[in-house]
UniProtKB/Swiss-Prot annotation:
GO annotations of cellular component type: cytoplasm
UniProt organism field: Legionella pneumophila (strain Corby)
Signal sequence interval, chain numbering: none
Gene Ontology biological-process annotations: asparaginyl-tRNA aminoacylation
Enzyme class: ligase
CDD domains linked: AsxRS_core, EcAsnRS_like_N
Family statement: Belongs to the class-II aminoacyl-tRNA synthetase family.
Protein's name in the database: Asparagine--tRNA ligase
Cellular location(s): Cytoplasm
NCBIfam families per the UniProt record, alphabetical: asnS, PRK03932.1
Subunit structure: Homodimer.
EC number, as in UniProt: 6.1.1.22
Length: 467
């Protein structure tokens, strides 16, 4: 039996010329010549480029099946791998047999025709869009970045912690959470006050889908020293923008005996490592993005990989913005959060490279961030990148129980719900720090695909959960 190879193996020169191979995949296009030949472009997802299958009318099923192949049909081809005579390809397969595995019903209505489709249209056929050049390339880049993240942290001595999806804690304190319940919606139990009685629910209390794994991973940080979580998070935020998803993935490292400077260094090392990796491992996909989606994206990745990030405090950033001649849509004032236009000005115009802004006013940051000695700012950091703005947000955590309690009171958080988190400050507390990186935002930045709905397999957004 002939060995089955991927198209990537065939095109990468791993197989000797004139060796008989079997490949499997889906038809992208087929064209016929008057000389009794069919040229089939076949892809299997293993790399960006398809491989050409040359079929002659000597095949037993040539007229009955081969000439009826259309885009989307699945097939198995066996034949000799030879040097290609055509332009733009080094190898092709001279078919000795073709087996049609699956036909496309009604080819005229098949959604993924051999033409360029808008990303908006492809969201309507999310189950078929991985068959397109753009989405398959995004998927391979997503894979390489995910693998690189795990590899980076493993090499740095971190342990991957699987934090829970279902939680009773709101890390962000914003309240935009999806409730998890098995209560009968037609017969909801009530307590003496007429409120929903969550003690009758599955977990015996009110529970939600997690908005972040940070609080949980902090617990493991207090025993394992260097940990990270990489998993799905959920926000019930009714935002229909190119930057928001209701379900997305987060990378959240946490380091014990660490301060703000430590995570600033870690974030820079990680981003530089990821940019180098994707350029090395996904060169063909990045060439596609650079040519057809976001010209200059390769140069941008090279720039980040080679740059020393700029550092500035929030206060200095505000001064620089106020001193600039740029007209901003949103006001600039100490105490207000930086908007995307401010972030991009700092990274693209002022610094012309990634910049890490530190020490933000406590009022605009999370309750868990460490209060600085000035009593006004917290030891927070945001990494701002040219072309996108904020890509990483983090902080040194508040390890002093009395100050953490005060911040929770100021944020109107119920301390009873955070008893276990407060315990971490009671039993062997240490300075510790971490950050969060939205995975989809990273992929969007790397590929230049501007809408995060197009870099996750099945996007979850307000009004959309069809698959």
């Amino acid at each position: 039996m002939t060995e089955v190879f991927t198209i990537k193996q065939c095109l990468d020169g791993e197989i000797s010329i004139d060796e008989t191979v079997t490949v499997r995949g889906w038809v992208k296009t087929r064209r016929d010549s008057k000389a009794g030949l069919s040229f089939i472009s076949l892809h299997d997802g293993s790399c960006f480029s398809p491989i050409q299958i040359v079929a002659t009318d000597q095949l037993s099923n040539y007229h009955k099946e081969v000439t009826k192949l259309t885009a989307g049909c699945s097939m198995v081809a066996t034949g000799k791998l030879v040097a290609s005579q055509g332009k733009g390809q080094f190898f092709e397969i001279q078919a000795e047999s073709i087996e049609v595995v699956g036909w496309v019903e009604n080819p005229d209505t098949y959604p993924i025709q051999a033409k360029r489709h808008t990303l908006e249209f492809l969201r309507e056929v999310a189950h078929l869009r991985p068959r397109t050049n753009t989405i398959s390339a995004v998927t391979r880049v997503r894979h390489s970045l995910a693998q690189a993240i795990h590899r980076f942290y493993h090499e740095q001595g971190f342990f991957w912690v699987h934090t829970p999806i279902i939680t009773a804690s709101d890390c962000e304190g914003a309240g935009e959470m999806f409730r998890v319940s098995t209560l009968d919606l037609l017969n909801i139990p009530k307590n003496d006050k007429g409120q929903i009685d969550f003690s009758k629910d599955f977990f015996g209390r009110e529970t939600f889908l997690t908005v972040s794994g940070q609080l949980n991973v902090e617990a493991y940080c207090m025993a394992m020293s260097k940990v990270y979580t990489f998993g799905p998070t959920f926000r019930a935020e009714n935002s229909n923008t190119s930057r928001h998803l209701a379900e997305f993935w987060m990378i959240e490292p946490e380091i014990a005996f660490a301060n703000l400077e430590d995570i600033c260094k870690l974030s820079q090392s990680m981003l530089r490592y990821l940019c180098k990796t994707v350029l090395e491992e996904r060169a063909d996909d990045m060439d596609f993005f650079n040519q057809f989606v976001a010209p200059g994206c390769i140069e941008r990745m090279e720039h980040i990989a080679d740059s020393e990030f700029e550092m500035m405090t929030y206060t200095d950033a505000i001064k620089a913005l106020e001193a600039s001649d740029q007209k901003f849509e949103f006001p600039v004032s100490w105490g207000l959060d930086l908007q995307s236009e401010h972030e991009r000005y700092l990274a693209e115009v002022l610094c012309k490279k990634p910049v890490i802004v530190t020490n933000y006013p406590q009022e605009i940051k999370g309750f868990y961030m460490r209060l600085n000695d000035d009593g006004k700012t917290v030891a927070a950091m945001d990494v701002l990148a040219p072309g996108i703005g904020e890509i990483i947000g983090g902080s040194q955590r508040e390890e002093r129980l009395e100050i953490l309690d005060r911040r929770m009171d100021e944020c109107n958080l119920n301390k009873e719900h955070y008893q276990w988190y407060r315990d971490l400050r009671r039993y062997g507390t240490v300075p510790h720090a971490g950050f969060g990186l939205g995975f989809e935002r990273l992929i969007s930045y790397v590929t230049g695909v501007s809408n995060v709905r197009d870099v996750i397999p099945f996007p979850r957004t307000p009004g959309h959960a069809d698959y």
